[in-house]
Design a protein with these regions (language model features):
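Alpha-helix-loop-beta-strand connector modules within alpha/beta enzyme cores
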Residues: 86-107, 378-390
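Active-site mouth loops of central-metabolism enzymes
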Residues: 40-56, 110-118, 200-210, 264-267, ...
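Acidic (Asp/Glu)-rich catalytic clusters
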Residues: 63-67, 93-102, 124, 128-135, ...
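An alpha-helical appendage that flanks or caps ligand/catalytic pockets
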Residues: 5-11, 16-46, 158-193, 234-356, ...
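Conserved, mostly hydrophobic/aromatic
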Residues: 15, 65, 77, 96, ...
Length: 391
């Protein structure tokens, strides 16, 4: 494989907006009778009329982020999840493409291990054409719970992911028709009509939360690695693994190969931001509650990834370890809230310490008021982002 190095300034940082699009009406009392928040919590708690309002609010936030100066918008998908009303990242990306004009659209990402790769390739190519070449295609394995939901053995997840990745790239770069004799996705005839606008294909990013294997895989392919909210010390360890692997592959990685996601909110005063920011703890107690065999079934993660997971404190999405307090999460720069001046100072620290080329702002959670989120987006665009780009 020939890797084409990316080129970026050593100090330039791009800032992306992200929302899980939560169904923020769920409470601890709603969840209390159920063993698991994903496997057992029923959709009788879902109100389509309320969801209609929420979806339109989230789309308005996308449009506002585009207007005030965010470089991109990140989206994702999850299944059987009240904290993420996005069962299809491609549907959400289509909406983003129509309500925005300038921003890149980073899809982190398509769960290609559990879906038809040819259909994924066609849909992403279609989105790239609709958006005018603004798509960044992120590929993910899917969570362990989603693997179980799909009726697929967790031990096959990574192998399926790697085959699906190779097939998608072939669909984008090889004229059809052709055959694909894969173990998991055999096709006698493939002849995709729609191909991406970007050549040879849209940029590919790979996200992760702590698995060394994921970092190594991303580096071997020359793909930027996006760390989704691990603590800074672990994130720097993962970045070192990326650098070591990149050197083995013959290229020198820069900031353009690394991004970092953190929960972040800006308000007019520190006091107001602190109050609103506590909503980031909405999923702390119940997001992945349930039997360990649902959230971490045997074979889904390597022993090394499991060792790392068990040794670190919980920051909102884990199932093992000591849970951190709101104050500790802020001290660790995992949650950043405050006035523009406070947030600028904290993000400058992260930028200097981690040197990411991309900062991904997880800016909405639970039942945060739409007006507060819109104000946060505005303050990011008018105050915070310009300051980060001046450095």
């Amino acid at each position: 494989m020939t890797l084409v190095p990316l080129r970026r300034s050593q100090t330039l940082v791009d800032v992306y907006w992200f929302s899980e699009q939560p169904y923020g009406y769920v409470t601890e009392d709603d969840l209390a009778p159920y063993e698991s928040g994903r496997m057992h919590f029923p959709n009788t708690n879902f109100d389509p009329e309320k969801a209609h309002v929420l979806y339109n609010n989230y789309h308005e936030q996308y449009a506002w982020a585009d207007e005030v100066g965010f470089d991109g918008i990140m989206s994702n998908e999850h299944h059987s999840s009240y904290w993420c009303m996005k069962p299809s990242v491609n549907v959400d990306a289509a909406v983003i493409a129509k309500v925005t004009k300038k921003t890149k659209i980073a899809m982190l990402g398509n769960v290609i291990a559990l879906n038809d790769p040819v259909k994924m390739a066609e849909e992403i190519a279609m989105l790239d054409c609709i958006s005018g070449g603004r798509i960044i295609s992120g590929f993910v394995r899917g969570t362990a719970v989603e693997t179980l939901h799909a009726g697929i053995s967790p031990t096959e997840n990574r192998e399926r992911f790697e085959e699906a990745h190779d097939l998608i790239l072939k669909c984008w770069t090889t004229p059809g028709p052709f055959r694909w004799e894969g173990r998991h996705f055999p096709h006698r005839m493939i002849n995709p009509w729609v191909v991406p606008m970007q050549k040879p294909h849209p940029p590919v990013w790979f996200p992760g939360t702590g698995s060394p294997e994921s970092v190594i895989w991303a580096a071997k392919h020359g793909y930027p690695y996006m760390n989704l909210g691990s603590l800074l010390d672990l994130t720097k360890q993962l970045k070192s693994i990326y650098h070591e692997t990149a050197h083995e592959m013959g290229f020198e990685p820069g900031p353009e190969h690394f991004g970092y996601l953190m929960r972040c909110l800006v308000a007019d005063t520190d006091e107001k931001a602190q109050k609103i920011g506590r909503t980031f703890l909405w999923t702390e107690n119940h997001r992945n509650r349930g039997p360990i065999e649902f959230n971490d079934p045997p074979g889904y993660q390597s022993r090394e990834a499991m060792r790392i997971k068990m040794s670190r404190p919980l920051i909102g999405t884990g199932t093992m370890g000591r849970r951190m307090t709101y104050e500790e999460l802020q001290e660790a720069h995992n949650i950043v809230v405050g006035s523009p001046e406070t947030v600028i100072k904290k993000l400058r620290y992260v930028k200097k310490d981690l040197k990411p080329g991309y900062i991904l702002i997880y800016g909405n959670e639970g039942n945060m008021r739409h007006e507060d989120v819109m104000r946060s987006i505005e303050l990011f665009g008018t105050k915070v982002i310009p300051a980060l780009k001046e450095d």
